[in-house]
């Protein structure tokens, strides 16, 4: 399996899916609340169709687990599979905010082997397919991600899911000498850490594997790390696809 070629062949599809997501939002989205009490729109569904169709063309024998496909979330004892989140940050998407992303991560032997993330409004595309092979497309050209480039040990900057930190998160920030943090809700947080714009992120158990798989690959391939609070590896294909606690670090903090 040529993972580099697969990811590069997905890039155009992600640009197209991003443009569709914006056009559908301009027309006015059809929105509803799912059984898990989270929002979904026709934009999520249409982007999912485009992305999963292309992935099936490129890797017909690899299963796809998508947030927006309800019939594929039973425990299939998966080792090698795709995790797709067609719109991560649906709240931002349906409320005309900018940080939502389109995501696909390839899992091989329960670990992230490749990832691709596109933030359509910000027009930022990130992807990776192996160690030291993590990139952002800038002006149409792949630019290698460097998570160390803006590091200042006296001004450690984190991203956070919320402006108000829970006590456990606040304590971890203190241990890591975090000076400032910025709210960021989508998988874009993995990308900005991989790009050296921020230094890390801490989260209690929340969300699901499709929310983090692509970003996990990109950050690790850029030299960073993704572990739980006990410093264990994050593995994929768990029975309920739920995430454990997370600590994301740029290479500078390792």
Predicted segments, located by residue:
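Oxyanion/phosphate-interacting regions
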Residues: 1-14, 170-175, 191-254
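Acidic beta-strand-loop-alpha-helix segment within the catalytic core
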Residues: 104-191, 234-235, 239-254
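Residue-level signal for inorganic ion chemistry
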Residues: 21, 44, 55, 90, ...
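Conserved beta-strand segments of alpha/beta enzyme cores
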Residues: 63, 177-180, 225
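Conserved beta-strand termini and adjacent loop/short-helix elements that scaffold enzyme active sites
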Residues: 67, 183-184, 229
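Glycine-rich active-site/cofactor-binding loop and its immediate structural neighborhood
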Residues: 80-121
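N-terminal subdomain of lithium-sensitive/metallo-dependent phosphomonoesterases centered on the IMPase/IPPase/PAP
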Residues: 1-87, 171-174, 191
